């Protein structure tokens, strides 16, 4: 799930922290990708024309392998060096979110049994998609044969991605989960592994710009996310993104906010703090996540194991041999090039002051309002 409405809040309050990029922009960059999130996308999106998942002769799904193979090739073609990070065991506190997902799953299964229209059946089937251990195992085998590094995190994949980015092992963490920002990755990329056919630009979030423009510390930003609701606990019921930001800026911490609620200094019939709220434990998971220290992680991009790759993808999984061989050549070509020095690596970029960031944020907001106003006028015409 990530953090509810956080992307909307940043888009409205700090639009200058989000850049829309073409994939070519990231040539020469190393990126740590949330593999579990990517596999989930592939299982939903990579399908036949009738909406059914791809499968081999044995009837087992192969959508995850096709997505992993071709989306990785696309990145390699554009000079990006991807590494994938897989989820480990979820933290105990995540049981809250997992229980919610289980209830939603049971509800969807009941609706699927009652569905009669094909479109409705496919919609419910997609909602039931789940990344299973064997999907992860096959994806890891594929990556090994392709020569692409991967890491199995002790717990949350996005936390491990952020750890690699913070240390400079990679340029950015790539995930659809906005809670990646709470783990203090310098840069978050969204939509990196989306299909090219969707024509969605890659979103680049600059964490420092977000923190500085909102004038929040990392701890306060995490508290903001917890107010909105995260994977580890419920948020304050009835509080939307604008009021969540007001609360944290006015009171400074969740402890102070909870105290004000308990004393009756903050009162709203629509707002309610969850009973037995474990916000401190949730905050600790963001501040001190269970990760492998980056100095213990070695990332190596190697020559693909051509014969073994053909054996696995063609003979075992039924993929077209010519296409797999073509993919192997693309891998060889892309990985030989290496990570070239980018022009911006020769210059030290001075961080902007809070005043400069505030001015940039105001300009971006004004531009957004003007664009929205023009759109309304055009619709009237």
From Swiss-Prot:
Q: Which stretches does the entry tag as region I-domain?
A: 120-251
Keywords (A to Z) from UniProt: DNA damage, DNA repair, DNA replication, Endonuclease, Exonuclease, Hydrolase, Magnesium, Metal-binding, Mitochondrion, Nuclease, Nucleus, Phosphoprotein
Look up keyword Metal-binding and say if it applies: yes
Entry cofactors: Mg(2+)
Q: How is the cofactor bound?
A: Binds 2 magnesium ions per subunit. They probably participate in the reaction catalyzed by the enzyme. May bind an additional third magnesium ion after substrate binding.
This entry's Enzyme Commission designation comes to: 3.1.-.-
Q: How is this protein named in the record?
A: Flap endonuclease 1
Native organism is: Kluyveromyces lactis (strain ATCC 8585 / CBS 2359 / DSM 70799 / NBRC 1267 / NRRL Y-1140 / WM37) (Yeast)
């Amino acid at each position: 799930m990530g953090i509810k409405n956080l992307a909307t809040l940043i888009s409205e309050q700090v639009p200058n922290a989000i850049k829309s990029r073409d994939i070519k922009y990231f040539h020469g960059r190393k990126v740590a990708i949330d593999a579990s999130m990517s596999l989930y996308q592939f299982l939903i999106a990579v399908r036949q024309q009738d909406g059914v998942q791809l499968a081999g002769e044995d009837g087992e799904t192969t959508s995850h392998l096709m997505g992993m193979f071709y989306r990785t090739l696309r990145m390699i073609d554009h000079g990006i060096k991807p590494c994938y990070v897989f989820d480990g065991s979820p933290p105990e506190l995540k049981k809250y979110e997992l229980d919610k997902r289980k209830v939603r799953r049971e509800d969807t299964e009941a609706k699927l049994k009652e569905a009669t229209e094909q479109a409705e059946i496919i919609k419910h089937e997609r909602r039931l998609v789940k990344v299973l251990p064997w999907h992860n195992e096959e994806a890891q085998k594929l990556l090994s044969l392709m020569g692409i590094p991967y890491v199995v995190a002790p717990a949350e994949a996005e936390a491990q991605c952020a750890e690699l980015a913070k240390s400079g092992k990679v340029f950015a963490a790539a995930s659809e989960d906005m809670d990646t920002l709470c783990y203090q990755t310098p840069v978050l990329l969204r939509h990196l592994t989306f299909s090219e056919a969707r024509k969605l630009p890659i979103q680049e979030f600059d964490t420092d710009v977000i923190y500085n423009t909102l004038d929040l510390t990392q701890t306060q930003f995490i508290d903001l996310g917890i107010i909105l609701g995260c994977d580890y606990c419920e948020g304050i019921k009835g509080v939307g993104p604008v009021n969540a930001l007001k609360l944290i800026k006015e009171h400074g911490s969740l402890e102070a906010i909870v105290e004000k609620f308990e004393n009756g200094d903050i009162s709203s019939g629509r707002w309610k703090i969850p009973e037995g709220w474990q916000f401190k434990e949730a905050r600790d998971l963001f501040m001190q996540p269970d990760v492998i220290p980056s100095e213990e992680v070695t990332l190596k991009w190697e020559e693909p194991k051509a014969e073994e790759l053909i054996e696995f993808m063609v003979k075992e999984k039924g993929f077209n041999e010519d296409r797999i061989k073509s993919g192997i050549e693309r891998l060889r070509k892309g990985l030989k090039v290496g990570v070239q020095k980018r022009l911006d690596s020769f210059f030290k970029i001075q961080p902007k002051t809070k005043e400069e960031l505030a001015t940039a944020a105001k300009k971006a907001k004004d531009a957004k309002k003007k664009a929205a106003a023009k759109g309304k006028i055009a619709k009237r015409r």
